[in-house]
């Protein structure tokens, strides 16, 4: 959805629940600016409601999948019209990400926001669930500036990210979906898969080994 406000019939409301389990404005979600090139999401991969409806990791993933679609349409289906449509939409979303989702962080410089609304508001965070900002290299997103990618990774794996936690036994990214202070194995796996150093990969493997079980969210303090 690139015109959620004007054209979408979608809404979602749930009664008697926590605020992250339903959408505001009678189920439409927070207001976003239409026609900016980004695609709308009501909920994050964690199943929590988006604060701002343009979820950047999902838009990044969309550009990757549209690239696959372009290749399949061209090489397998021999459908040049479909290939051109996929390529055009991929470029539109990619350009919107690069122009609207890069913001300045006091500690890390230019980084990708997790969510934006198209009006200038944004959310600086990352969640353990994929697609995530931490997973952009794993998913295959092609950023215009690698320094922004590295800055974003450094931000995500720091206490500047409100869902990053450190304890005496482990450290990593957690989620709004579980209790504060708990890290997720899925984020540790993505961190390891995208790491460029053997030392970091080994440290993550040791962290996973020491928890004894691969479950959703261990405490880094136990």
Report each predicted region and the residues it spans.
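C-terminal hydrophobic structural anchor segments
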Residues: 171-214
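Well-ordered alpha-helical scaffold segments within catalytic/enzyme domains
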Residues: 60-78, 134-145, 187-199, 222
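Intrinsically disordered, compositionally biased terminal peptides
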Residues: 1, 221-222
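Conserved small/polar residues in nucleotide/adenosyl-binding loops
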Residues: 215-220
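Extended ligand-binding clefts on enzyme/binding-domain cores
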Residues: 2-63, 76, 83-183
């Amino acid at each position: 959805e690139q015109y959620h406000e004007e054209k979408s019939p979608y809404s979602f409301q749930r009664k008697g629940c926590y605020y992250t389990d339903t959408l505001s404005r009678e189920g439409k979600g927070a207001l976003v600016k239409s026609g900016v090139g980004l695609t709308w999401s009501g909920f994050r991969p964690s199943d929590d409601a988006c604060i701002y409806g343009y979820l950047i990791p999902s838009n990044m993933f969309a550009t990757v999948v549209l690239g696959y679609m372009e290749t399949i349409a061209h090489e397998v289906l021999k459908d040049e019209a479909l290939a051109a449509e996929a390529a055009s939409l991929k470029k539109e979303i990619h350009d919107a990400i690069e122009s609207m989702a890069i913001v300045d962080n006091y500690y890390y410089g230019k980084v990708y926001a997790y969510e934006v609304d198209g009006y200038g508001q944004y959310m600086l965070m990352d969640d353990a669930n994929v697609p995530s900002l931490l997973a952009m290299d794993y998913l295959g997103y092609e950023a215009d500036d690698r320094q922004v990618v590295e800055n974003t990774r450094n931000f995500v794996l720091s206490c500047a990210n409100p869902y990053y936690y450190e304890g005496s036994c482990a450290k990593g990214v957690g989620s709004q979906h579980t209790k504060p202070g708990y890290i997720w194995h899925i984020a540790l796996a993505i961190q390891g898969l995208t790491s460029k150093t053997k030392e970091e990969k080994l440290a993550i493997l040791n962290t996973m080994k020491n928890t004894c079980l691969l479950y959703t969210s261990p405490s880094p303090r136990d």
